[in-house]
Amino acid sequence: MEILSLHQWKQQQDTKSSTIRNKQVDQDVLRIIEQVQIQGDEALKHYTLQFDQVNLNSFEVTSNEWEQAIKKVDSTLLDALETAAGNIQRYQSEMLESNWSITPETGVKLGQQVNPLDRVGIYIPGGKASYPSTVLMDAIPAKVAGVKEIIITSPPNKNGEIDPVVLAAAKIAGVTKVYKVGGAQAIAALTYGTETIPSVDKIVGPGNIYVTRAKKWVFGDIAIDMIAGPSEICIFADSSAPVPYVAADLLSQAEHDEEASSLCITTDRSFAKLLQEEVNRQIPLLERKEIIEASISQNGKIIICDNNEEAINTINQLAPEHLQLMTIDSEQLCPKIKHAGAIFIGNYSSEPLGDYFAGPSHTLPTNGTAKFSSPLGVYDFVKKTSLIQYSKNKLAEAADTIITLAEAEGLTAHANAIRIRKENDNA
């Protein structure tokens, strides 16, 4: 794990080229989307055979498959999922918004109506790991919001099955249906619908670059949560932080994939050296060490800042997905952080606490988008409608002002819609 001054790190960032706009990936994704639009389920069968090496006659997980899968899940794991689900539901319930109205003056009523989306789709990745936690984190906010139909798509394994733990989590979270479809083809199916899979109002959930680019291309035809990149962790630590804890937390994110980013910011060069040694000591002990080594080699850095102010400015510029504050004054520093997906405060608020258990969703903005984006929550699964009600007298009072504004924009039909009421009432 490389130790760099802030200046050196910034120079490295300037020389990095973005890989998100991969023209070949976009060409492949657009072809897949087009084929799913044209051929529906037949295209899904073709791509599932091509990419997942399994020939499926049907995509929906049946109730019997669901029940049998859940029976395979260890009771201790089921209890853990239930406990985490309870924490998530409790946290997300605090975000619920209600309808409201005001009467600023007699004859005028203004308000807002909050309604859940009708149907949402959640993409759950397969591949290098199973993600039942993502099922809970993405589906429970939708359920709390009042969404009636919650659909999951996830790539099947070589036996044409979905991981039983994912299905157990889906049942606990209140998911309506699960389909064995992955990749860009799943995003296309959720957007445009097929003979089997209905179209949805919004797609949420992480995926590989094909899923991510597909979500970007269908945005506008449906809503999406965000354009997610590789996982990120940034830890601001000083000599008060236990070095083994900091190292373990950095490596916990590095095991996601080779592109994951693990940064530690500190003002203490001696601490940085100890951390570097501890990271090197821990890596060989970990099960996914090959992925971790590749990730740390490419994207693992310890950045030396001159003082706390410089460190805070760097963090806010970076806007990391996960930020851990492991300094002697973590609570005092927290209000100074303006841009981060989630902030973990203190030595015992390890990032995996947020991944699995605490309650806030672990679906967070990446690639600096925490500067303008928020974590996934209940508010992502509702829409708001403005309510406007004027009495005859109040419209008459406002008529001349409205007509003046409409005519100033050259929209005489707008003006006429008001004038006709004014003249009719005065007749």
Curated annotation (Swiss-Prot):
One of its GO terms (molecular function) is NAD binding. NAD(+) binds at Y123, Q185, N208. NCBIfam families: hisD. InterPro entries: Ald_DH/histidinol_DH, Histidinol_DH_CS, Histidinol_DH_monofunct, Hstdl_DH. This is Histidinol dehydrogenase. SUPFAM superfamilies: ALDH-like. Binds 1 zinc ion per subunit. The keyword Amino-acid biosynthesis applies. Its cofactor is Zn(2+). It is an enzyme of class 1 (oxidoreductase). Zn(2+) binds at Q253, H256, D355, H414. The gene is hisD. One of its GO terms (biological process) is L-histidine biosynthetic process. One of its GO terms (cellular component) is cytosol. PANTHER family: HISTIDINE BIOSYNTHESIS TRIFUNCTIONAL PROTEIN (PTHR21256:SF2), HISTIDINOL DEHYDROGENASE HDH (PTHR21256). Gene3D superfamilies: 1.20.5.1300, Nitrogenase molybdenum iron protein domain. Belongs to the histidinol dehydrogenase family.
